[in-house]
């Protein structure tokens, strides 16, 4: 290899080089995004003006709405925007055909349509939500201006579809062709780094339980990563055929990771109790078996897991899993020599049953990750998709709020005949749609109003004091660029995103000239007054009409979280594990966002999630064990141990639907009865944990009992049940 010249080596050794690359990976990405926004916006505006489209600004606004730092997100938003625009335009033409001569009926039907679309956006909470948003406010944006001239409604819809299509084409072209940022690369990096953090978390947890705060923080991170990776997976199919061919394995990988975290949380909860019980000798007895896994994970902790690393990990885990049963028998013999009581023996068996299942899941995860290196693989076949869970009341509240806003503003417009009333109403429809899928629509609407007010001030200066003095498209770009740069910069900052969006979209709506520029200060001021008033009404409605960040929604989502146990008990077994895992985490992720700024509420929700996952997962394992029982009288449906498990299931359903001290007492009695019935039953197989069905059943029952009695669980706040509950 030829050595570099001395001056080049000197440049490479400078400290500024490291700082430059740090900047390029952080703020540099933002400035590349801003440059691409400018390029796409001005390309779209130039083409729209050259093609003499009626409203070139509509095409340019499309760029501001769909542009994202990563090209996959742009493709996804463009796809759903086009679908939403077509649906909204079709509905607008239908409403005009039905109610063109009756403004009141038209506004009522439009309000219902926008409400339904807003509810759909709140229910989906991904890029599909964007399709609902566009379907709602496209009908308003096209229908309201043409209400006075219904004969032009169809052509208005056609022109809008063409303008938006032009904006979508330019956005996707610029995003993919100029310094592209791939969502696929972001997803691969997230997958690689996620396992490194998890391996370190597990390795340290097997040696000694984590502190409560660190344990909760780590789990919140894993939940956010699972939800985020699912979002990335749904985006990468639009941009990367390499990832599209692995879509099933990526789905499977995320599902297996969620199961992994649940199994480790269950194991950690048991280890924490055993470690804190000074009188128990169980922790010392099981520790040698756990250290072997911790040592194997040490080599993968804190670094990315590549496909080759995953294959190596899978081989190590296969060897460890093969040697584990013999090691457990050896440790059990040594433990029995100490003459432990029944409760300690159950703890011993439960700990190794949980460990064995965790290793199985970890091995399966490693195999799936390693299979990503191949274009085709048998693990691609996966029919347990990620199943998001949304509260229907929260979605309905969003729809009711949107319909109410449109009815109020539309009625005001009809009653006053204000010339800018149509602008106020359609901008309110757009605002309520854009804010419907956010955790805090009040804040988003208010920020958009602030951005619009700022855009009005800047726009007035440019429209009446700058535009008359310029000539030609280059000078127009020159005077618009500072506003767009500032707006895009604000939009890239989460704390000021609403201000940036409002500035970009509504400065363009009211201040960017068409091919034939009309200078009318009266209309300009009235239109911007209508825009700001519509947004402020949206903000007020978001604060008053069923606000999503209020106590009622936290309580409802907490109830939905608890009812996931009911789903685990009564749901269809096929695909139940994945649906339970993803639905529970999705509910927690929503509730945690709605409860922002309320740490006590967030902590309570997180504790409920832990107990729901622990009990629900154990119930699903019990159901799976019973579904594959051998044909033998000892495992018949009529056996007392199976009947007692059904009774326990009904008791758990009552407890999690309506938590109370009496229901907790009944559930514990039912669990203890199921344990005693299983202990009293005989079976035809050797009593080893890898061959005995009843031993595995006992382990899961015992774990359910310890979860119900966990002092850190929210069930502990119900009060200590009366009586002496003991597994023996």
Model-derived features: positions:
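A transmembrane helix-and-boundary motif of multi-pass membrane transporters/channels
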Residues: 1-241, 245-246, 364-375, 380-610, ...
């Amino acid at each position: 290899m030829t050595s570099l010249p001395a001056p080049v080596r000197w440049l490479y050794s400078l400290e500024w080089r490291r700082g430059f690359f740090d900047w390029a990976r952080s703020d540099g990405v933002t400035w590349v995004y801003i440059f691409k926004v400018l390029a796409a916006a001005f390309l779209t505006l130039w083409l729209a003006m050259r093609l003499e489209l009626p409203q070139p600004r509509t095409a340019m606004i499309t760029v501001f709405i769909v542009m994202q730092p990563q090209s996959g997100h742009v493709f996804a938003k463009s796809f759903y925007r086009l679908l939403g625009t077509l649906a909204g335009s079709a509905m607008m033409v239908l409403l005009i055909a039905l109610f063109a001569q009756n403004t009141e009926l038209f506004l009522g039907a439009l309000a219902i349509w926008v409400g339904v679309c807003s509810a759909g956006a709140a229910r989906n909470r991904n890029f599909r939500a964007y399709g609902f948003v566009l379907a709602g406010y496209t009908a308003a944006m096209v229908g309201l201006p043409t209400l006075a001239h219904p004969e032009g409604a169809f052509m208005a819809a056609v022109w809008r579809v063409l303008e938006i299509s032009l904006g979508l084409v330019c956005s996707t072209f610029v995003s993919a062709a100029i310094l592209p940022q791939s969502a696929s690369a972001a997803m691969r990096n997230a997958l690689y780094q996620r396992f490194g953090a998890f391996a370190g978390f597990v390795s340290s947890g097997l040696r000694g339980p984590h502190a409560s705060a660190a344990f909760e923080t780590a789990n919140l991170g894993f939940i956010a990563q699972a939800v985020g990776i699912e979002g990335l997976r749904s985006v990468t199919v639009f941009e990367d055929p390499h990832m599209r061919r692995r879509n099933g394995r990526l789905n499977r990988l995320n599902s297996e990771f969620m199961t992994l975290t649940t199994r480790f949380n269950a194991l950690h909860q048991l280890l924490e109790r055993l470690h804190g019980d000074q009188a128990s000798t169980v922790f010392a007895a099981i520790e040698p078996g756990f250290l072997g896994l911790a040592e194997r994970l040490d080599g993968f902790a804190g670094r990315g897991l590549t496909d080759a690393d995953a294959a190596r990990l899978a081989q190590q885990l296969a060897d460890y899993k093969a040697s584990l049963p013999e090691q457990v028998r050896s440790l059990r013999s040594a433990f029995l020599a100490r003459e432990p009581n029944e409760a300690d023996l159950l703890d011993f068996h439960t700990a190794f049953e949980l460990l064995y299942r965790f290793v199985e899941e970890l091995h399966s995860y490693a195999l799936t990750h390693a299979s990503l290196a191949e274009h085709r693989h048998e693990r691609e076949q996966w029919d347990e998709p990620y199943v998001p869970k949304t509260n229907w009341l929260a979605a309905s509240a969003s729809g009711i709020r949107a319909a109410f806003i449109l009815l109020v503003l539309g009625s005001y417009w009809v009653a006053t005949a204000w010339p800018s009333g149509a602008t106020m109403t359609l901008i309110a429809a757009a605002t309520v749609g854009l804010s419907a899928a956010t955790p805090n629509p009040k804040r988003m609407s208010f920020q958009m109003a602030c951005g619009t007010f700022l855009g009005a001030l800047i726009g007035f200066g440019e429209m009446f004091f700058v535009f008359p003095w310029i000539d030609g498209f280059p000078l127009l770009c020159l005077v618009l660029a500072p506003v767009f740069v500032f707006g895009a910069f604000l939009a890239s900052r989460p704390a000021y995103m609403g201000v940036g969006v409002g500035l970009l979209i509504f400065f363009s709506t009211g201040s960017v000239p068409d091919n034939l520029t009309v200078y009318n200060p009266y209309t300009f001021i009235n239109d911007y007054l209508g825009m700001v008033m519509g947004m402020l009404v949206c903000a007020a409605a978001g604060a008053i009409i069923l606000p999503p960040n209020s106590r009622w929604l936290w309580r409802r989502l907490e109830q939905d979280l608890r009812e996931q146990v009911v789903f685990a008990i009564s749901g269809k077994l096929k695909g139940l594990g994945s649906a339970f895992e993803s639905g529970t985490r999705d509910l927690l992720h929503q509730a945690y966002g709605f409860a922002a700024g309320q740490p006590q509420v967030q902590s309570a929700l997180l504790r409920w999630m832990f107990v729901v996952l622990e009990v629900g997962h154990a119930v699903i394992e019990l159901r799976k064990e019973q579904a594959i029982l051998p044909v033998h009288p000892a495992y018949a449906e009529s056996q007392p141990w199976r009947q007692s498990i059904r009774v326990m299931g009904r008791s758990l359903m009552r407890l999690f639907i309506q938590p109370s001290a009496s229901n907790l007492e009944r559930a514990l009695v039912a669990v203890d009865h199921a344990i005693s019935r299983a202990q009293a039953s005989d079976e035809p197989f050797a009593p080893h944990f890898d061959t005995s069905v009843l031993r595995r059943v006992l382990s899961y029952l015992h774990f359910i009992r310890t979860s119900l009695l966990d002092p850190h669980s929210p069930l502990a706040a119900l009060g200590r049940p009366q009586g002496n509950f003991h597994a023996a």
